[in-house]
Structure formats: structure tokens, C-alpha cells
């Protein structure tokens, strides 16, 4: 696999990771779970995924 | 290249990075105008309508640059205003030693996620990583430095050894005990550690075999001095430049290092701009972009900062674009001369602290018995940076304890305790400030050991 296709595949996986992390944060904010520490950690993970996507660069 | 940090950006065509950055700048200006109170106020005051901006050329023509005075004018008396914005996780202040007030930088979770990325480029390019220990010596308080250093180490997989609170002897001991591969220091502090190590008979090249990298920041330094440091420490010099305004490192030396060549042919190395993170302009006094080899003011726009971006912020630093056509590392990032970034105003770095003489003026001349003073910044016989004040009083019998009172007042104002000597009335007959041209205090002389061969 050349580096371009490896990078394209990585960007695809990170996109799925971002979608999943955002979904987790939405689910965690359900007040019946009542775990602000979990919500806060997911917010931090989402911010880090945004930074990760910036460093990966545009597709 | 080897020792890279992110091949995609390091080898991207310069035109592609530029296109990416210019597009993002327009987005940032629009968002800042909508969401950041300072820019709403500032752009309204300059009648700027960001919706009219279509290209970077439009922005360069119409978007006003920002200075510290603008930020302080907005923040005046409302230090905590930024903290009440939603999503704020930290607040970083500038050092506050200018006498002009402190800039306030609220940070959100996106800022914290980005805080260590620039520094990690610097460390990885300097050959650190993989659990290497790095001795940190730069002092910090409510400034960005503390979280920045920790985040940079974490992102580069470097283990920080926190030497802020150690004295110089303790720091030399920490280099040995922790088997540090790297040392982060200002040039002046490295000079101090060198004098102490020489006095102790320490030979780092053999006694500290793990040490291979020294990352300098905060001050310019001479080529001959740098060469001497590399020889003595048996380590390669590197440099990183950044500020609270840039959310960490924006320029860093590549694996080639801060000095290139050998023997008498040693020249300054290259700082590379992290152009996908910070947009860099170098503006000559006439406002035009500086060309290769030319100096100008560093003007930055942050592309990653979220809660408080800096847009066309005039840093007050004078920088030289690399006169060479390329760097041996082969990276496409913009290039600047290492070791020669210096202040345009009167600011002096002393022991890692930003000191504006005007702030010392206020502290010393506040006493009615003081008529004038002169200050000398110098490197003492033990390599320590000292500030000596000669203070002239109106009376031949000054108040008791005046030296102590002045030491305390200066320490409170700028964080440095000076040596104080009282001199009799009429000692100083020369004018304290220049009569014409840009204001430059003449009360101060700087005679440091590390900056002897500054280019003009």
C-alpha cells in the first residue's frame, strides 16, 4: 500500500472515530446516566479528535 | 529527512499550505467577528465588514493589525470578562511586566487539545521522543508556559523534568540524576549553567553522555557563543519560538539545528514556520512584506486557536527571513534565521522574564527622593544574569532602608530583584531619554555574554 492510500484509509478511520465520539458524547449527556465526568472526558476526546483531523490535513 | 513530525505538512507544496491557510484565515476572521467580544468591538471600531472579504489580498488590505495596546484597551478593568464565556477551561495571561497591563487569553477545550502540538514539532525535530527526559527551566505562573510545556512533552512522548523551582546547581544535578536527553533554557540561563558546570569541573560531553539536545528560546544569541555551547555540552543546539498569543511554538529549528557548518564556517540555522498552524507575515517598516534576507516585524494569525484567536497580531519582534534559497532538511515550510529574533521595543529578557524599562521607571521613580537612575544588565563572574541599579537621590542623606524598599518595589513590578547602589545628587548629567527618533530609554545598558555577534 503506498503512503497516499494509507493516509486515505487513516482519514476514513478517523472520520468514523469522530462520528462515534460525537455520538458517545450525545448519549452520555442523557441525564439518566448522570455522569458529568464521563461527559467531560468525551468532550475532551472530541476536541482532541478535531485537533487530530487538522494535523492529518485535508483529504 | 529523518526525525520528522508529520510528513504530510512537512512535504506539502508551499502553495498548497498557503492556499489552506488563506482559506482558513477568512473563516477565522468571520467567526471571530461573530463570537469573540474583542474582535466584535475592534472591527466595529475600524468599520470592517468581514462578509466583504473574498481573498487573502482583501484581508491584507482591509483587516487592521492588532497590538498589545488594542487588547489591553479592550480588557481594561475587565480581566475576568473572558472567563464568563461558555466553554472556557483555562485562562492564560501575558507576563504583565510591560507596565501596560496584561493580555487575557481564555482557552476552551479545542485550545487545550492544540496546546502541545507546536511544541511537539519542535521537540521531535530536535531528536527528542520515545520517553526521553527533558529538563525544563523556564519559570511560569498564570502564563501559558506551564500547561504548554507539559502538553508539548506529552504530545512528543517526552518526559518532563520540572526544574522550575530548582537552583542552578539543582538543575545540573537533575540533568545527571534523570539522565536527561534534553535541556530547555534561555540562552542566558544556559550561559549561567555553563559557568557553574565549568566551575565544578563538570565535562558534560563525557559526564552527561545522555544529553544530546538543548532547546533555546526567548532571546537572541551569538554564533560563536552557540558554537562554544555545542562543544562544551556535546549537544546540538535547537530553538523554538512561540508566545502566549501563538498558543505555543510557531517556529522551530529543523533536525539540522540552530547552527550549521563547522569550524570557522559555522552560520545560523533555520527556523521553520508551522505554516498550517500559524500564518506568518514579516512586515517591513513601510508595510511591505520582507523578502529573503530582509528583516521586519513578525505579525501572526493563529489558525488553530479557538476561544481567542490572534488575527494579524503585531508581536513587536523583529525577525529575518532566511537569505538562503532552501534548507538542507528539504521541508517546504517558510524559513527564518535562527538565533536573531529580537525586540523592536525596549523590552529586555532577564532570567526568562519580559522586562520593560518603563515598568522599572515607574517602580523606582515613584519614590519622591529618587531623581534618576541607571540600570545595567550584565552576566556576572558566575554566569548569572544581574541587574544593577545606580539610584540618584535628591538628598545627600537618603532615607534609611531605601535600597531594600527599591529592591522590593522592582521585584513586585517585574519579578527581578536588582542590586541597588545609592549615588549622590548630581551624579547623572546625561539625558535619560533620546531627544529624537523612536523612544529608547538610555537609562539601561545591556552587556550580556550570549548576544555578542548580532547581525544588523
Residue ranges and their predicted role:
Chain B
Residues 183, 304-414, 439:
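AMP-binding/adenylate-forming catalytic core of the ANL superfamily
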Residues 221-326:
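Conserved AMP-binding/adenylate-forming
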Residues 2, 6-7, 66-233, 238, ...:
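Active-site phosphate/ATP/adenylate-binding loop shared across adenylate-forming ligases
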Residues 160, 237, 280, 373-375, ...:
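Generic structural signal for residues in well-ordered beta-strands
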Residues 133-136, 299, 390:
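Short, well-ordered beta-strand segments
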Residues 209, 273-277, 343:
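Short, solvent-exposed loop/turn segments at the edges of secondary structure
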Residues 1-93, 99-114, 125, 286, ...:
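Nucleotide 5′-phosphate-binding alpha/beta core
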